[in-house]
């Protein structure tokens, strides 16, 4: 779990912040999405993504590392079997934060943090590879033309 930063915290103490983030992560994995304040969602995201990465590895050591944070065995089982399986093709970006209207009562900025369950589109990967190939080809084309010109001048 990330060490709380110096300065203002989400709660009164570092221990309370760790417990609060652990509870929010448990709720996120249990329900798939939670509504909270924007600062809490931004602090929860790196923790949740790290836990999903550990769950994708799937061995006993990483299960024990996750159990340090999430103490509910049924949620850990769901994380390792269902959620990690859904995220197998995804290389990161397992969560999404969506801003919503401010909370009634204190007008605190609210947000929904949810797990991204849509499958990764292979089309995006192919497009990125094609763009990279065209950039490489474009960079090599002037070099090849310059080499041909110097070869002709040498003859």
From Swiss-Prot:
Keyword Ribosomal protein: yes
Record keywords, A-Z: Ribonucleoprotein, Ribosomal protein
Keyword Ribosomal protein recorded: yes
Listed InterPro entries: Ribosomal_bL17 (IPR000456), Ribosomal_bL17_CS (IPR047859), Ribosomal_bL17_sf (IPR036373)
Entry-linked Pfam families: Ribosomal_L17
MF-aspect GO terms: structural constituent of ribosome
A cellular-component GO term for this protein: cytosolic large ribosomal subunit
BP-aspect Gene Ontology terms: translation
Subunit-level organization: Part of the 50S ribosomal subunit. Contacts protein L32.
HAMAP family, per database record: Ribosomal_bL17 (MF_01368)
Family to which the UniProt record says this protein belongs: Belongs to the bacterial ribosomal protein bL17 family.
Protein name: Large ribosomal subunit protein bL17
